[in-house]
Structures are given as structure tokens and as C-alpha cells.
Amino acid sequence: MAVNPLDFLKNMSGFKDNIDNFKKEISQIVVCGRAGSDVVVVEMNGEFVVKKVVIKEEFFSDLDNEALEHMIKSAFNDAISKVKEEIKSKTMGSIPFGI
């Protein structure tokens, strides 16, 4: 069966619109990665840009440097995982099979 080039171009235009909609949805995602019972909280958007890092002051004196570094790393990794999951949940039903 031959493919009509005009139909193909129409479909490509729709595909571009879908991509633009995905980008908009993804940019609106905001997640919080947490570590150490919320001692460290990292807020990140769907484009993996960190918007905020919060470290509870009352734990500074109780934590050594290595423990704090580990919690910060864990909170970042948690946020990254959550962004990936949000992107996956928003796009899986909308992307045509095989793409």
C-alpha cells in the first residue's frame, strides 16, 4: 500500500503538536526528593532543574559532614527518580506504539 505524502505531512504536524504538548506538561512537573526523614528535601522540576534545597537546621549539629553529604545525594537521586516516573506516567499512554 502506497503512502500519500500529504497524509504523512499532516501526521507529522500532529506529531509536532504532541511533542510540544509533552514538553509543556513535563515543564510543569514539580517533585520533592527526600532523605533522612525530611532532613534534606530537594525540589526539582520536570526538566531536572533544582528549584530548592532545604536542610533542617536542627540537624546540623547532630550530623557529620559525610552523613549530610549522603543525605543530600539521596534526596537528589530520589527527586530524579520521581521526575522520571512522572514523565513516564504522563507519556506512556500518549506515545504511539513503536516510537
Curated annotation (Swiss-Prot):
GO terms for MF: DNA binding
Coiled-coil residue spans: none
DNA-binding recorded as keyword: yes
Repressor recorded as keyword: no
Signal peptide residues on this chain, from the entry's feature table: none
Subcellular location: Cytoplasm, Nucleoid
Keyword entries, A-Z: Cytoplasm, DNA-binding
GO cellular component, one term: bacterial nucleoid
Main localization of the protein described in the UniProt heading: cytoplasm
Gene3D superfamilies membership: Nucleoid-associated protein YbaB-like domain
Family the entry assigns: Belongs to the YbaB/EbfC family.
Classification via HAMAP family: DNA_YbaB_EbfC
Entry function: Binds to DNA and alters its conformation. May be involved in regulation of gene expression, nucleoid organization and DNA protection.
Quaternary assembly: Homodimer.
Protein name per the record: Nucleoid-associated protein EbfC
Species in which this protein is naturally found: Borrelia turicatae (strain 91E135)
The gene coding this protein: ebfC
